[in-house]
């Protein structure tokens, strides 16, 4: 239970006690979605001259966000603004995406893992909580397996990991890649939209929301970046057995309208971790923070508070 006075305590009060009329709707949150970079941001140097664009906000236990291939650093701001009160939130662009270095050869999963550790080293951070979503949950898993001493806890939001394997996720990702390669970015967005967003949110946003988010989507990445990312997503370990080796406290968060992982699947997945638990967000889709940014941040803050209390 979160202790009175902790950041998680106040976030939970907000999430549980606000009247429906006081809550910011998903549409209002997405109206605040940012895609612009900070021109004065400093880049961190990592392996072989790789430079990573990053932003750091707040103070306290460190939360490192891990982008899926469809997100960039600016998009995290609206989904971590409350979390940055009482925590240090560090967001960065993956190598090969956004404002980070674009090497001639796209990074492997192992190189992405080393980039995470290199960024922590550059910022003199000993340990961090990894906040991952969709395909970046694979990166969080691999960092925790290869560098357990650097990981204090893991949040898997709408994970691309399954309790029995990743075959279903791979089929979906392969279909996304095929759409992108044959029909382009706008077609990929139309393909993704009903699979990523929950039904409630799609109804709330309507056609104006669909079109507005499409403009943001097209501004976030290039076709080349997404092709590279989706091709990488089709590689790497798929067995759920490796999860038993992850000792870090782990929180699985899904929406009950996530088409890629059911609530019962989330429970089974959490049970694969020695120190795992799960939360189901009503009405949310594959990326639950899109549907309820405040509620999601409250769950993450509560999880961190509980881990910090036990430490």
Task: Describe the residue ranges of each PLM region.
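Conserved alpha/beta-hydrolase catalytic His-Asp/Glu region
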Residues: 166-167, 185-242
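Catalytic active-site module of serine/aspartate enzymes centered on a nucleophile-bearing elbow/loop
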Residues: 276-311
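Flexible "cap/lid" loop of the alpha/beta hydrolase fold
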Residues: 141, 145-146, 152-182
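Conserved HGGG/HGGXW glycine-rich cap/lid loop of the alpha/beta-hydrolase fold
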Residues: 46-102
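Alpha/beta-hydrolase fold catalytic core
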Residues: 1-64, 85-87, 125, 301-311
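Acidic catalytic loop of the alpha/beta-hydrolase fold
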Residues: 257-261
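Short beta-strand/loop motif that positions the catalytic acidic residue
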Residues: 246, 252-254
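Active-site loop/oxyanion-hole signature of alpha/beta-hydrolase fold enzymes
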Residues: 81, 90-132, 298
């Amino acid at each position: 239970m979160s202790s009175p006075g902790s950041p998680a305590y106040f976030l939970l009060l907000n999430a549980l006690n606000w009247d429906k009329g006081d809550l910011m709707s998903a549409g209002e949150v997405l109206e605040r979605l940012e895609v612009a970079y900070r021109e004065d941001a400093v880049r961190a140097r990592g392996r072989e001259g790789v430079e990573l664009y990053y932003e750091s906000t707040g103070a306290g236990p460190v939360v490192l966000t891990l982008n899926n291939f469809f997100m960039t650093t600016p998009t995290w701001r609206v989904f971590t603004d409350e979390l940055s009160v009482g925590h240090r939130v560090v967001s960065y662009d993956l190598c090969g995406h956004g404002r980070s270095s674009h090497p001639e050869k796209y990074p492997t999963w192992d190189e992405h893992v080393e980039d995470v550790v290199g960024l922590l080293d550059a910022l003199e951070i000993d340990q961090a909580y990894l906040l991952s979503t969709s395909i970046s949950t694979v990166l969080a898993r691999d960092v925790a397996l290869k560098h357990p001493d650097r990981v204090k806890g893991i949040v898997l939001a709408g994970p691309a990991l399954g309790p029995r394997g990743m075959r279903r996720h791979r089929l979906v990702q392969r279909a996304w890649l095929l759409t992108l390669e044959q029909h382009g970015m706008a077609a990929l967005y139309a393909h993704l939209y009903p699979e990523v967003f929950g039904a409630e949110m799609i109804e709330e946003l309507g056609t104006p929301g669909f079109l507005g988010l499409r403009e943001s989507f097209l501004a976030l990445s290039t076709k080349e970046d997404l092709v590279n990312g989706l091709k990488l997503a089709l590689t790497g370990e798929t067995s759920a057995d490796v999860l038993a080796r992850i000792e870090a406290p782990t929180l699985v968060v899904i929406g009950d309208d996530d088409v890629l992982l059911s609530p019962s699947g989330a429970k089974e997945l959490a049970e694969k971790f020695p120190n795992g638990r799960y939360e189901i967000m009503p009405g949310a889709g594959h990326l639950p923070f899109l549907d309820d940014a405040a509620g999601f941040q409250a769950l993450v803050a509560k999880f961190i508070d509980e881990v910090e209390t036990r430490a």
